[in-house]
From Swiss-Prot:
It is found in: Cytoplasm. Residues 1-21 are annotated as: Disordered. Its EC number is 2.1.1.182. PROSITE patterns: RRNA_A_DIMETH, SAM_RNA_A_N6_MT. GO terms for molecular function: 16S rRNA (adenine(1518)-N(6)/adenine(1519)-N(6))-dimethyltransferase activity; RNA binding. S-adenosyl-L-methionine binds at residues 28, 30, 55, 76, 101, 126. It comes from Chromohalobacter salexigens (strain ATCC BAA-138 / DSM 3043 / CIP 106854 / NCIMB 13768 / 1H11). The keyword Nucleus does not apply. Keywords: Cytoplasm, Methyltransferase, RNA-binding, rRNA processing, S-adenosyl-L-methionine, Transferase. Specifically dimethylates two adjacent adenosines (A1518 and A1519) in the loop of a conserved hairpin near the 3'-end of 16S rRNA in the 30S particle. May play a critical role in biogenesis of 30S subunits. This is Ribosomal RNA small subunit methyltransferase A. It comes from the Bacteria. It holds the Pfam family RrnaAD.
């Protein structure tokens, strides 16, 4: 795991310094206390769990989570926010700050260390819109170390995560996430709940990694490649997008019409395609 600086809060005044949201970090700070309370209720944190918050910002979720469980680790990239967090939560001895980029963070290594090694992580965050998709793919690689994830994301991204085959939102993100996790689209958060106010609505999503995928790909790396290739050109047919992988004989054996478009395929069908390619590879 990268050597992220790790620090506990230190005693100072508990009044954090002012901070302006930064566009390059995609920062929009949650302000609505009603929304904050509702998020904490759906997370339902317990003191025997290990909670990790990505991008605590100015601590809108951090404070009620700490009040609920007494211990919390956060990952923050913006160095200008860290002094304020350290000040604000100095009286919580089990508040730990990891300074660094969540996209580079080794969540599996984190779960394997500490006072309770091996205890799965509960990951929480109001994720910046500009990194939400790559961060979810990164977290999926550590799914074995994660109990669940609760994120606030752009509403459109949540709709893609929770989409069904045949819908306009169904795509690579939907398939790969639903292969690995149960997805619950919980509720919408209006733009006015944030400062500065974003141009789009947000939503809360829950991701729970499967103990075993409902449909098992024999080679998950190959499955990921097949999904990426299948959705590479959404308006093209499967025959076109997967022409280097399957011929008409293979499509007939799979009982899948190669004239279909990728957004009509279910996770189960894509797994069957990947498994057929794996089984018939020279």
């Amino acid at each position: 795991m990268p050597d992220f600086p790790k620090e506990h809060a230190t005693p100072m005044s508990n009044r954090p310094p002012a901070h302006q949201a930064r566009k390059r970090f995609g920062q929009n700070f949650l302000r609505d206390t009603g929304v904050i309370d509702r998020i904490v209720r759906v997370i339902a944190p317990r003191s025997d769990q290990r909670l990790i918050e990505i991008g605590p910002g100015q601590g809108a979720l951090t404070e009620p989570l700490l009040d609920a469980v007494g211990a919390l680790e956060v990952i923050e990239l913006d160095r200008d926010l860290i002094p304020g967090l350290r000040v604000q939560f100095f009286n919580y001895p089990d508040f730990v700050i990891h300074e660094g980029d969540a996209l580079q963070f080794d969540f599996a290594a984190l779960a394997a260390e500490g006072e309770t090694p091996g205890k799965p992580l509960r990951v929480i965050g109001n994720l910046p819109y500009n990194i939400s998709t790559p961060l979810i793919f990164h977290l999926l690689t550590a799914r074995g170390a994660i109990a669940d994830m609760h994120f606030m994301l752009q509403r459109e991204v949540v709709e893609r995560l929770a989409a069904t085959p045949g819908s306009a939102a169904w795509g690579r993100l939907s398939v790969m996430t639903q292969y690995h996790c149960r997805v619950d689209n919980l509720f919408v958060v209006p733009a006015e709940a944030f400062t500065p106010r974003p141009k789009v609505e947000s939503a809360i999503v829950r991701l729970i990694p499967h103990d075993e995928p409902p449909h098992v790909a024999h080679d998950e790396a190959l499955f990921g490649d097949i999904v990426r290739e299948a959705f590479g050109q959404r308006r093209k047919t499967l025959r076109n997008n997967l022409k280097t992988r399957l011929d008409d004989t293979a499509w007939a054996a799979l009982d899948i019409d190669p004239g279909r478009r990728p957004q009509t395929l279910s996770v189960e069908e894509l797994v069957r395609i990947a498994n057929h390619v794996a089984e018939t590879a020279p």
